[in-house]
Amino acid sequence: MLSSTFVRSKAGLVPVILAALILAACTGDAPQTPPPVNIQDEASANSDYYLQQLQQSSDDNKADWQLLAIRALLREAKVPQAAEQLSTLPANLSDTQRQEQQLLAAELLIAQKNTPAAADILAKLEATQLSANQKVRYYQAQIAANQDKATLPLIRAFIAQEPLLTDKAHQDNIDGTWQSLSQLTPQELNTMVINADENVLQGWLDLLRVYQDNKQDPKLLKAGIKDWQTRYPQNPAAKNLPTALTQISNFSQASTAKIALLLPLSGPAQVFADAIQQGFTAAQNGSAVTASVPVTPNVTESSPTDTAAVVSDDTPATLPAPVPPPVVTNAQVKIYDTNTQPLAALLAQAQQDGATLVVGPLLKPEVEQLSATPSTLNILALNQPEASNNSPNICYFALSPEDEARDAAHHLWEQQKRMPLLLVPRGALGERIAKAFADEWQKQGGQTVLQQNFGSTTELKQSINSGAGIRLTGTPVSVSNVAAAPASVTIAGLTIPAPPIDAPVVSTSSSGNIDAVYIIATPSELTLIKPMIDMATSSRSKPALFASSRSYQAGAGPDYRLEMEGIQFSDIPLMAGSNPALLQQASAKYANDYSLVRLYAMGIDAWALANHFSEMRQIPGFQVKGVTGDLTASSDCVITRKLPWLQYRQGMVVPLA
């Protein structure tokens, strides 16, 4: 028999249990309350959900839901709506809410392309007080605010973010760190001051030095990376190498035993093809004089047949580094005329003949066909298509005005010029050059580039006779969509598309902001253009003048050099005086036709590139110091040329220091 005490206790529990069940049933019928809000965590729902919760929540939770809604709106590229919500946040926020508000404000400014203001806000945030999720966003915002420029704060942001990431995001961070480090100049690297406890950063900098010291020798580089991994076992890159360096570990040298040279040896382009072939053959035989010698000739007056750049007696010749000794191998070269068969048939014939590498074709229509012509052969094309495809077996080497214009964009940017005007000949050539310059200009962070076209020499003479100068006005250059539009921004793995850009502002008078003019003209055209610019500008507002190699040709005597006073121009190292013996040899061969001399030089460098095809294709930053420029390859193996720049000064041509 149960005790009366137990019965009474059990009976007393019944009302309590019943009450609990009744309350539970009532709760089930009531509207569900959203879970507690954590603004420091992920915001994975869409903006409509958060805005709905904002409307339905109590005053205590409204600010939290609003902050989450702003983050979702940014993720959905609804930038104006995000800005509106941010501006209506209440003033009485908690410290946690205030931190999230500031982080969102920085992300909004980045989406609006106002990176300086975003950087100011980020500088006031204390990262140690942020959650792990917020830290990822904070460092991503710092990276975006630096506009991917190689700076110490940018590299530190990558390093700080690395432990917070996993999988693909982690590898992307490693690759981003390496890409930023790779953009540092030797001077920046040598003057960089870091803290004693920045062991990870020190390891990265040592890896960069290993790479820079050994990148010209794949075997040494591979050994250097392995040694670095032993010395820095805890560095994140020791466990997961940057993708670019992983490629080096898998480096394999391609065979160049048999080379097929594809050129138009008949037809209207034959004269150009002959010059390239002769340069290629001379380099193959070692008969091209390639030992570089500093040149400081004592010349005060030059004859029309001068073949070397003229430098003053008291000006040191700052010329390109010596080119490497000629690559002399036992390679067999067979030449094919591209005007005799279709490209696909020639490639098949070359492969049947045992070729392991193809150099050519030269003409752009045939180069455009390469991507649609399947071939397992390695191919060094001697021109560049309008849109290059990243084919693992193709590199593109062009000696074109567009290539020179891209180098000019870099040079003007390095000269601190920010508002360039392009003076180009009317027609397709001028349009291509202007587009190439503007594309490269905007990749560096430049804004709108203005373009003005000029007509024939007769038209220029008529203008100058009527007293008309050239005003510093122009129309915006139309560039490709990728280059013209601001880049989208990725924050914490979320891509925010760029907002629409405003219409460009065009300078309409000579008192505008134009600070540089890049001129594509022949010597006779430049003789007329320069005084016309002088007529329309005052000495105080005169911009710096730059020209292409098109303006530097044989026959330019002392009078011409005096008239061109102050103009800077670019040309290949051979023409700039890096190798006077070779220049004299080539100039005599082609009767001072500098156009053919440059193509002869292209043939010499094509031989060097063919023998370093694997390095150019597989090792980022690998460089060949050629007679047409310092040659490196982009990620899709488009060979870029860094050219020397010279200046007309007191009747002489001097290297630009």
Swiss-Prot record:
Major location (coarse): membrane
MF-aspect GO terms: enzyme regulator activity
CDD domains reported for this sequence: PBP1_YraM_LppC_lipoprotein-like (cd06339)
GO BP term, example: peptidoglycan biosynthetic process
Signal peptide stretch: 1-25
Lipidation (S-diacylglycerol cysteine): C26
Membrane association type: Lipid-anchor
Domain of life: Bacteria
Record-level GO cellular component terms: periplasmic side of cell outer membrane
Family matches, as InterPro entries: LpoA, Peripla_BP_I, TPR-like_helical_dom_sf
Protein localization: Cell outer membrane
Lipid-binding residues (covalent, N-palmitoyl cysteine): C26
UniProt keywords, alphabetically: Cell outer membrane, Cell shape, Lipoprotein, Membrane, Palmitate, Peptidoglycan synthesis, Signal
Pfam family, one: LppC
Heme among keywords: no
Family the UniProt entry places it in: Belongs to the LpoA family.
General function of this protein: Regulator of peptidoglycan synthesis that is essential for the function of penicillin-binding protein 1A (PBP1a).
Quaternary data: Interacts with PBP1a.
Protein name as it appears in the record: Penicillin-binding protein activator LpoA
Classification lineage: Bacteria, Pseudomonadati, Pseudomonadota, Gammaproteobacteria, Enterobacterales
Gene it is expressed from: lpoA
